[in-house]
Amino acid sequence: MSVRDIRLLGDPVLRTVADPVATFDRELRRLVDDLADTMRDAGGVGLAAPQLGVSLRIFTYLDDSDEVGHLINPVLGPFSEEMMDGEEGCLSLPGLAFDLRRPERVLAVGQNSHGDPVTVEGSGILSRCLQHETDHLDGILFIDRLDKETKRAAMKAIREAEWSNEPKPAVKVSPHPLFGRGR
């Protein structure tokens, strides 16, 4: 178990559709542990494997009781018709957050690190997290879902961000400047 570097916007792995997990072994469980350690260290509420440079369909999240959970090969749906507005950030875009509308509730099904079936019902922040992290597995970043005006502001903020001109698109973000340490 270790804390790894978090990939930043600009790293091609963040725009790649991640591969399904087929082998549930010790190496996979080590990756899940590293995701959890890195997420906690960075003060995030979710972290997907592509954010560590690993193109596999895995993410970790903090549940409503602040416990770390994980989903492998997740599928989302159904989504509630009720929507929620709220500020959303990302460990791969440190220090930035923008208002984004998402469904209030979602059901997520997938597997745990042993290959057993898992179902997670999320509402509020957990729903937002499940949707955000699944987007990462599909090569989608939350800024892709912003309305036109907010996206313009986001692009300006990204260009002005200290990390956007880094020569390497990976940096250890610990703790995340927006969320602080822990939740």
Swiss-Prot record:
Cofactor(s) of this protein: Fe(2+)
The EC number(s) this enzyme carries: 3.5.1.88
EC category name: hydrolase
Free-text cofactor note: Binds 1 Fe(2+) ion.
Gene: def
GO MF term list: metal ion binding; peptide deformylase activity
Residue positions binding Fe cation: 90, 132, 136
Iron among keywords: yes
Family: Belongs to the polypeptide deformylase family.
Pfam families from the UniProt entry: Pep_deformylase (PF01327)
Active site: 133
InterPro entries on file: Peptide_deformylase, Peptide_deformylase_sf
Biological process (GO), any one: co-translational protein modification
Protein name: Peptide deformylase
Keywords: Hydrolase, Iron, Metal-binding, Protein biosynthesis
Species for this entry: Parafrankia sp. (strain EAN1pec)
SUPFAM superfamilies with a match to the protein in the record: Peptide deformylase
Top-level taxon of origin: Bacteria
